[in-house]
Amino acid sequence: MIGDGKLLASAAWDAQSLNELKAKAGQDPAANIRPVARQVEGMFVQMMLKSMREALPKDGLFSSDQTRLYTSMYDQQIAQQMTAGKGLGLADMMVKQMTSGQTMPADDAPQVPLKFSLETVNSYQNQALTQLVRKAIPKTPDSSDAPLSGDSKDFLARLSLPARLASEQSGVPHHLILAQAALESGWGQRQILRENGEPSYNVFGVKATASWKGPVTEITTTEYENGEAKKVKAKFRVYSSYLEALSDYVALLTRNPRYAAVTTAATAEQGAVALQNAGYATDPNYARKLTSMIQQLKAMSEKVSKTYSANLDNLF
């Protein structure tokens, strides 16, 4: 049986590891159901990442064959990390489905290889997995069920998986991370710009205090004094990417003692209240606005989860 460690150490579910898994499954199919499920879960994450990347602009200052290669390698690493340990739960659901109502074969029973091959994988990629990814694109939870704008989809595609990884490392609820980025930047459509009009990638509205040694941009923003909104000039931090912005945001919350209640919050809603109590923003309704965003995101996640469950039969 292939151990999880060896499976995760392979080069992002490549053809060699698939063929090795096929051989092992032929020798002991029942014992290798879980590795097969883990492999499919890993491929699904990669397909989801690929679909998200395809939603992003293809041309840009930093777009090249090299950056696309590094991005692909980074996505492979994300897929490995996302499916390590408990993973996303998709593998467990597949194992439960495949073993439901079945008994383990006797030692002398004829061995039938599990129906899993590279050709089957390619078929999944072109059909069922792609359909699942498309159905997983978030939509607003209101009664009209209207899809989010393209900009909002791009915004979520950029931040969803990195936010979950950041949550696992920092303790900050991932729905809170996404909700705050969405609120501060208007789902990525009202981002803080640099003086030359280029994006600052500062989707969390982090100001440039005296301790900040990096580039800054000065804009007019809204602050509240005694509950009254006022327009003021303020300096904000400038980053080179969303990942850098996310990393700095997490560092800000985890290294500053006043945000301790945020990193230990049991729920995203509690984290939102802790953020306001810690003085992250001057808006007296900040926690309420964040909670509204969090509820929208959770409703989206629930829809995605139901989509996965309803379509598992199509995987095998």
UniProtKB/Swiss-Prot annotation:
Source organism: Salmonella typhimurium (strain LT2 / SGSC1412 / ATCC 700720)
Residues annotated as the enzyme's active site: 223, 248
UniProt family annotation: In the N-terminal section; belongs to the FlgJ family. In the C-terminal section; belongs to the glycosyl hydrolase 73 family.
GO cellular component, one term: periplasmic space
Function: Flagellum-specific muramidase which hydrolyzes the peptidoglycan layer to assemble the rod structure in the periplasmic space.
Pfam families, A to Z: Glucosaminidase, Rod-binding
UniProt keywords, alphabetically: Bacterial flagellum biogenesis, Cell wall biogenesis/degradation, Glycosidase, Hydrolase, Periplasm
GO molecular-function term, one example from the UniProt record: amidase activity
Additional note from the record: Exported via the flagellum-specific export pathway.
Name this polypeptide is given: Peptidoglycan hydrolase FlgJ
Any GO BP: bacterial-type flagellum assembly
Consequence recorded when altering residue 248 to N: Reduced enzymatic activity and poor motility
Segments for region (Catalytic): 151-316
Known EC number: 3.2.1.-
Chief localization: periplasm
Subcellular location: Periplasm
